């Protein structure tokens, strides 16, 4: 058990240090696993193939808007989320529409954030405008 906790502590520390250069500002309302993955996705996006797109310490504000939330009742209930993730960096704005369906809201968030691809058309456009 201690080894597992130590592994996750090291993982979160590495992710935090890795993304700290960009000062990602992510809302606390997002479940922790989804927030960690969101940090990884934006870090990958902003590194643009191994080269930093923005200078160290540049703030990147990430917000979200839940467009739709649906829940199916019953013993096999699921939650579906339609979300728009909004990013602002150096005056450049981008919106990334994502959806996720999961067993609960945290799972739906995680599945939605997995669909935020660092090399998507929206991400590439955001990175090009930052350069």
Regions flagged by a language model, labelled:
Residues 2-10, 87, 101, 105:
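Generic alpha-helix initiation/capping and coil-helix boundary signal
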Residues 1-2, 92:
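Generic cytosolic/nucleocytoplasmic N-terminal low-complexity/intrinsically disordered segments
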Residues 17-22, 28, 32-33, 51-63, ...:
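Generic structural signal for short, solvent-exposed loop/turn connectors between secondary structure elements
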Residues 93-131:
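C-terminal/domain-edge helix-coil "capping" segments
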Residues 3-11, 15-49, 125-131:
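A structural "domain/chain start" motif
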Residues 31-39, 78, 102-110:
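Solvent-exposed, acidic/flexible segments
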Residues 48-53, 59-99:
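Surface-exposed short loop/turn segments
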């Amino acid at each position: 058990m201690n080894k597992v906790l130590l592994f996750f502590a090291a993982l979160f520390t590495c992710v935090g240090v890795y993304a700290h250069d960009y000062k990602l500002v992510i809302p606390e309302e997002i479940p922790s696993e989804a927030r960690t993955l969101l940090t990884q996705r934006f870090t990958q996006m902003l590194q643009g193939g191994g080269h930093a797109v923005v200078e160290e310490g540049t703030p990147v504000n990430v917000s979200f808007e839940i467009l739709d939330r649906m829940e199916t009742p019953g013993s096999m209930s699921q939650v579906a989320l339609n979300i728009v993730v909004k990013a602002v960096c150096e005056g450049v704005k981008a919106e990334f529409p994502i959806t996720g369906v999961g067993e609960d809201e945290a799972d739906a968030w995680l599945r939605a954030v997995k669909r935020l691809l660092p090399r998507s058309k929206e991400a590439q456009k955001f990175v090009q405008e930052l350069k």
